[in-house]
């Protein structure tokens, strides 16, 4: 998982390779993201992210749980399928219903999932101090790429 914020003043990017995910045969899914797992180019950005914005000591995980409409075994054809993941996105303790366009593709041993969507910090009660507000975009681009192994 990766997020990216761009403004004329500064770009901010972080990656997290500690995400756990589950996709069931009926299309039900769950993603869990440990907030402390995000890594930034600058240590100070990471510290501010965890202590001041996401408050990882209080809200240690983000999550997205729901289902993919019309998810069937017929999708195991090796082709890429556009789907809509519907569920509850929880960030900073705030739940929000979301519909996120995604692609799924059977790779022979499991599912490759990709999605790009935006999150507004204000929608999740994440307060950005006025002094740095022009350095953080009002919407953050989130990219998810996951390979889920069938069990």
What positions do the PLM features span?
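Low-complexity, acidic/polar, glycine-enriched regions of mature
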Residues: 1-151
